[in-house]
């Protein structure tokens, strides 16, 4: 498990918090089970690592990617249980769809380790939807879209253009 901690610290060290996507402020980060879905390359991994870096205690958090070689030998549930016993409170699992039988293990983590919060990402919607265990009543789900033109301008030009909902635009606000 030490290799997971080492990899996590390295990833965190190389994560910039200069630009944070809009979805960050809309996520209920204190929910017990959070799913962040979106296409490959939209920034899900960066969003997780930025949140940890800005708001979490590193000694109570662990970021893992579900396709790590570690999981060829060890089960996700066993790793989560061991992490919890070491004082872990928040487990971030990236690319969950790459782990076989992921939904059953996440359900078991949720049901059997109530003191552990789980936040996971996934980009293969088909693999996520065919997960065997029903997580719909347990999870809060968010979708991270690709970069909007407004976000692009904010990043490239250093602007701070606000975001408006369709209702606000139609109302002329």
Predicted regions, residues:
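Interdomain motor-coupling "hinge/lid" segment immediately C-terminal to the ATP-binding subdomain
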Residues: 2-12, 123, 130-173
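Pre-Walker A adenine-sensing motif
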Residues: 11-29
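Hydrophobic anchor at the beta1->P-loop junction of P-loop NTPases
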Residues: 36
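Walker A (P-loop) phosphate-binding loop of P-loop NTPases
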Residues: 40-41
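Conserved lysine of the Walker
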Residues: 44-45
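Conserved P-loop NTPase "ATPase switch" module shared by AAA+ and STAND
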Residues: 85-102
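Structural recognition of the conserved hydrophobic beta-strand(s) that form the central parallel beta-sheet
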Residues: 117-123
């Amino acid at each position: 498990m030490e290799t997971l901690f080492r990899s996590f610290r390295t990833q965190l060290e190389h994560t910039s918090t200069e630009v944070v996507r809009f979805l960050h402020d809309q996520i209920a980060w204190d929910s017990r089970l959070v799913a962040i879905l979106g296409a490959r390359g939209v920034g899900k991994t960066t969003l997780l690592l930025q949140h940890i870096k800005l708001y979490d205690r590193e000694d109570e958090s662990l970021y893992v990617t579900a396709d790590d070689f570690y999981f060829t030998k060890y089960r996700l549930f066993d790793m989560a249980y061991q992490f919890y016993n070491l004082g872990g409170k928040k487990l971030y699992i990236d690319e969950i769809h790459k782990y076989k039988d992921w939904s059953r293990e996440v359900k078991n983590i949720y049901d059997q380790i109530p003191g552990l919060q789980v936040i996971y990402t996934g980009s293969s919607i088909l693999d996520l939807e065919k997960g065997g265990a029903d997580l719909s009543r347990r999870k809060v789900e968010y979708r991270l879209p690709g970069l909007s033109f407004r976000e692009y301008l904010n990043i490239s030009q250093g602007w701070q253009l606000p975001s408006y909902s369709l209702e606000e635009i139609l109302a002329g606000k």
